[in-house]
């Protein structure tokens, strides 16, 4: 049975169902389904706002909570997987902005005004905070923010949830996107590495989220690039990912949980037979 701990940082995952439901609706126009799922999706957004925010309205999570178990994000002394690290988690903030925008579209269409009346202010306030406090002008990158207001130095793929929002002005977004083409960062033999290659924790075999190439985050990056007009870069990444997945399939006869960033090979301790997880994304990316 489903269960959660209201104050357990690992008990909830990324709030992505509104994204999938909206894509489903735009393709099939199922009004009955949209009417059924909207109140649940709106309620969960509000639950996260109530139970996963710091007092300034920004969001927290954890390694497990973001789905990126061992990504090196929290300060020393905190558990990488289980702790929120007294940190403002960039992807959790960006995902809530994305979701609020989607719920606004749903709410306007369904004329459910009362359930979405504060969402525009949420988007405005959270976007302003990220731009002012979580952007490094020196690095041209978005980071998590620690309790002492300093920024993390970890450059992770989670920053590219910004592509699914209007948080960054064009000049800043261009700089963020440039890192995807940088061979010292995310442009490795198999794209897109989940952790920048110049990070001390980066592993050639991926070691899960210490550089591993994951189908879900690749889909997030590619679809965001297309949405924001970076179509050439999106095409290059798609073809690279598709060809690497195909090479590994020809060698092993199966699809894998995730892949190594430095070679056409499964990632370290990756599980095989992940067809539902890794079979569709290359084809979805190609479309």
Q: Where on the chain are the PLM-derived regions?
A:
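Leucine-rich amphipathic alpha-helices with coiled-coil/heptad-repeat character
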Residues: 24, 48, 52, 103, ...
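A near-ubiquitous, low-amplitude feature marking generic local secondary-structure context
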Residues: 31, 79, 113, 145, ...
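Residue-identity detector for glutamine
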Residues: 27, 95-96, 114, 145, ...
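Structural helix-adjacent loops and short alpha-helical linkers that scaffold large soluble proteins
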Residues: 24-42, 107-124, 166-180, 225-239
């Amino acid at each position: 049975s489903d269960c959660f701990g209201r104050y357990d940082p690992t008990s909830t995952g990324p709030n992505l169902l509104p994204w999938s439901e909206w894509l489903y609706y735009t393709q099939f126009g199922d009004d009955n389904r949209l009417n059924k799922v909207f109140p649940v999706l709106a309620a969960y957004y509000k639950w996260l706002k109530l139970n996963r925010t710091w007092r300034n309205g920004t969001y927290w999570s954890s390694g497990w909570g973001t789905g990126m178990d061992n990504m090196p994000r929290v300060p020393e002394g905190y558990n990488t997987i289980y702790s929120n690290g007294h940190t403002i988690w960039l992807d959790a903030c960006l995902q809530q902005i994305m979701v609020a925008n989607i719920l606004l579209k749903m709410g306007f269409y369904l004329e459910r005004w009362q359930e979405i009346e504060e969402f525009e202010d949420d988007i405005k306030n959270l976007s302003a905070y990220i731009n002012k406090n979580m952007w490094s002008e020196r690095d041209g990158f978005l980071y998590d923010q620690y309790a002492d207001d300093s920024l993390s130095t970890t450059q992770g793929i989670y920053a590219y949830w910004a592509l699914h929002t209007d948080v960054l002005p064009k000049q800043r977004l261009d700089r963020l996107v440039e890192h995807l083409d940088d061979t010292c960062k995310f442009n490795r033999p198999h794209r897109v590495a989940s952790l920048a290659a110049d990070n001390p924790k980066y592993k050639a075999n991926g070691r899960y989220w210490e550089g591993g190439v994951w189908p879900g985050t690749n889909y997030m990056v590619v679809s965001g690039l297309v949405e924001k007009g970076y179509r050439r870069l999106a095409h290059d990444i798609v073809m690279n990912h598709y060809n690497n997945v195909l090479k590994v399939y020809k060698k092993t006869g199966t699809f894998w949980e995730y892949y190594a960033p430095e070679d056409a090979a499964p990632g370290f301790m990756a599980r095989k037979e992940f067809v539902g997880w890794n079979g569709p994304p290359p084809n979805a990316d190609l479309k």
